């Protein structure tokens, strides 16, 4: 899809046409969650299988469609190592204030939690992955994923977040 977006955009990536059929659909919902299956950033060249990197322009399109909640923890989270995690986190941090991400956790504390209040309802979000395609937590990484088999960390995160939200989405 990024190759088509580059062809359409010329000197930039234009993802709008790929999602044109969905324009307006998500307006009917108060909360729109998307599992972002690849690292998003402009530090690494766009790449597909087997080590993915998606151009940052995708988030403009997704934002304009109405997505505000993005899960970042998945099997491709470590595709570009610690630098990929940092680049992706920096990209998401530059998004508008109403964007919420979860899935990359501080590896020392695992307590950088994501909350969002919509129509007076506070949502808490957690995101996990089953595996990272055989890639270990990158050396030197400050942030990383929590694996589904890490029941102790997951239980602690759920217990920490429950009192602070009306709805907890895991």
Language-model segment annotations:
Residues 1-170:
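Acidic, metal/ion-coordinating pockets
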